[in-house]
Amino acid sequence: MNAMTLATLPVRLEALVFDWAGTLVDFGSFAPTKVFVDAFARFGVQISLEQARGPMGMGKWDHIRALCNDAAIARQYQEQFGRLPTDEDVTAIYERFLPMQLEKVAEYSQPIPGAIELLHGLRQRGLKLGSCSGYPAAVMQRVLERAEREGLALDYVVASDDVPRSRPAPAMALRNVVELGIADVAGCVKVDDTAPGVEEGRRAGMWTVGLLLSGNAAGLSLEQFLSLDEAGREAARDRARAELQAGAPHYLIDTVADLPPVLADIETRLAAGQRP
């Protein structure tokens, strides 16, 4: 690497791009999973919370399509309707899912412990705070209303239907780069609790941090998390790590409260000329 190239490398972070459910709000990412179960039940198809969590991180229509591609779920649908689920059937389930999600999402969107304090500290450092979500814009509006009441605010928000192609494609992360006026994607960190969300950051050229215990991968409520002893937490970490590694995160931590030491390490690596 020549001196001119080194001179153009960022020497400090410029921005973070956060996911929402399971990352900043909704410990355990329960709002979408429970509604997926209920939406499929309206069509006579029974799915488990574990099945509902499988494609988490995708846009919600894509998530339903992925669930319908599951052999066991598709078989139930065929028994009910005499055919495998088509894209039109996926849309019908999505149209049933959306109002149910709108009704319930704010109820689950309590900030994750440490998130508000973290964001306040990052702002004091002059970092820009972006975000994106697998939720469509209508649902995100409900999340943002609750977040604002709780004192949790970011500089920019992208919903899954704001871009032509959602996760794991990089469009939502890169929309943040453009709108926040970021000079170099290597100065950005993507923080997410799902493998597609981590992969989104990777494809966008960012540093990536996966969250082991606050989100979809572990699937623990805050009460369950707090009740675990260290052996229980380590077992949950192992389960989540196996899932999140599919997105190839640069770092894995328990929750956003553990992010500051990671950011310090990234800044050290940037100063040494490293890139994601």
Swiss-Prot record:
It holds the Pfam family Hydrolase. Its cofactor is Mg(2+). One of its GO terms (cellular component) is cytosol. GO terms for molecular function: magnesium ion binding; phosphoglycolate phosphatase activity; phosphonoacetaldehyde hydrolase activity. Homodimer. The lineage of its organism: Bacteria, Pseudomonadati, Pseudomonadota, Betaproteobacteria, Burkholderiales. Involved in phosphonate degradation. It catalyses: phosphonoacetaldehyde + H2O = acetaldehyde + phosphate + H(+). Keywords: Hydrolase, Magnesium, Metal-binding, Schiff base. Binds 1 Mg(2+) ion per subunit. Belongs to the HAD-like hydrolase superfamily. PhnX family. This is Phosphonoacetaldehyde hydrolase. It comes from the Bacteria. Its EC number is 3.11.1.1. Transmembrane segments: none annotated. The active site is at 19 (nucleophile), 60 (schiff-base intermediate with substrate). The keyword Hydrolase applies. CDD domains: HAD_PHN (cd02586). The gene is phnX. Mg(2+) binds at residues 19, 21, 193. One of its GO terms (biological process) is organic phosphonate catabolic process. SUPFAM superfamilies: HAD-like.
